[in-house]
Amino acid sequence: MQLKKLALTAAIAFGACVPAHAQTEIQWWHSMSAALGDWVNDLAKQYNASQTKYKIVPTYKGTYDESMTAGIAAFRAGNAPHIIQVFEVGTATMMASKGAIVPAGKVMSDAGFKFDPTSYVSAVAGYYTAPNGQMLSYPLNSSTTIFYYNKDAFKKAGLDANKPPKTWPEVFEAASKLKASGHSCPFTTSWISWTQLESFSLWHNTLFASKNNGFDGTDAQLQINTPLHVRHFENLAKASKDGSFVYKGRGNAADASFPSGECAMITGSSGLYARVAKEAKFAYGISTLPYYADVKGAPQNTAIGGASLWVMAGKKPEEYKG
């Protein structure tokens, strides 16, 4: 309910920053599909029904990559949407795009809209805030990496359905038992570079790039050949060869395989929950990202995922007034 309230507030805030004559359309491009796409459409309907001056028009523009690419092309062509949802991977690109965006904090303050960044977890607000303290975009669907498992499949394999694996050795052991019980896809992962590299490293209190993961300089280099990283990917490769781990593709290609019941375990985004809750026809459980218990400092914390709303520049001056 809190996320719904904040998202609706964002829509109202941005929608209030356009002229008040004839109904003005506010184009909102996003990458929310399935259950989350329905959620976005419902938010727009609620706002549109609350007044008659403005109309938010949500448009699904494909995956995060596709939506961002479309947004950049549209800006260059002079027909960018008013609002675009950009995943956290594209945050640095958007921050560096001077002249392409209008800081969300500025849009809201210019409109006389009171906005309190402390409504968010500090790490989330800080991620989208400039050094001068101004929020550049409005966090919409911040997420983190988590672990989902099929309780019914666990029971069939003789595993404790109320005791999800907490460590990677336990995951691989459970995957082997699921395979032995006849499951064709015991374990998979979505967003592999995020879940198995970025968050994996942070979860183990380990750097994955030089220059303090790039925060201390733009000449950073990946450092994913450490003993821990090599060990983990060797374990994944071994599991892949024996069929207990099934790679489903890049990005979120694996997402559908869990709620459908095809795969019994998956590491992915907390954002997948809405789809799992809506589509899964089996009992499921959720836990934290697995870790190697012998690594000092683990578990620690994971990387922020999800996306935020950016206001595009190039619109008529009056459209930014409330």
Residues of each region from the PLM?
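Glycine-centered hinge/linker elements that transmit conformational signals in sensory
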Residues: 172-178, 217-248
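Short, solvent-exposed loop/beta-turn-alpha elements that line the ligand-binding surface or hinge
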Residues: 105-120, 164, 206-231, 278-279, ...
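Conserved N-terminal structural module of periplasmic/extracytoplasmic solute-binding proteins
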Residues: 8-11, 22-98, 110-116, 161, ...
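Extracytoplasmic/periplasmic substrate-recognition and gating elements
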Residues: 49-50, 77, 133, 157, ...
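Paired acidic/hydrophobic, glycine-rich loop segments that form the ligand-binding mouth/hinge
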Residues: 82-85, 264-269, 285
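Short helix-initiation/N-cap motifs at beta->coil->alpha
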Residues: 60-70, 166-172, 246-260
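Extracytoplasmic/periplasmic solute-binding protein
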Residues: 129-140, 145, 155, 169-221, ...
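Hinge/lid segment of periplasmic solute-binding proteins
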Residues: 87-146, 172, 198-202, 285
